[in-house]
Amino acid sequence: AAAGMLPPVAGAIAQEVMRNIRFWVAGDTPSTSSRTVDAVLTDGDGGTSANHDTTVTVIGVNDVPTITNLSGDSLAYSEGAGAVVIEQGTNAVVADVDSANFDTGTLTASFTAGSDSAEDLLGIRNQGTGAGQIGVSGANVTYEGGTIGTFTGGSAGANLVITLNASATPTAVTALVRNITYQN
């Protein structure tokens, strides 16, 4: 049989082959344009079926965002020492393969065990407004001087929740993750 062609088969086998043709898209950000798949059956004796078109519509799936290189970090803290960044390796990376920004998303930092809600604080280090820097002004969080979100909580046992906007790119949120602080 020629490339892309099956050898002659009985009718029942041909039906089974047709029922098992599958379509898939490789990659995380496929085009959502419709595709047309054309099926033609020949009998090996010169007979050819009519063209049978099927339209395939690809519906994108929202892949989850990721934070890598943060798990396993360990922070040795002396009581009363002031705010210290939690991300000790300075190599955490935030990514989202199918979104250019985290508009309306949130970044939440919370204690999962052993917290003293009367004394433990989660916050955001204010580096400034320069290139690559995270800043804090009131409840606003900035990256390179542009607002990327607002925050609430972080004290009295409340989670630190940063609500992000369209300016919160993966690069900006990576910088933010690297500037979450702990203080007692």
What is each of the regions a protein language model found here?
Residues 1-184:
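Extracellular glycosylation-rich, acidic/polar low-complexity regions of adhesion-
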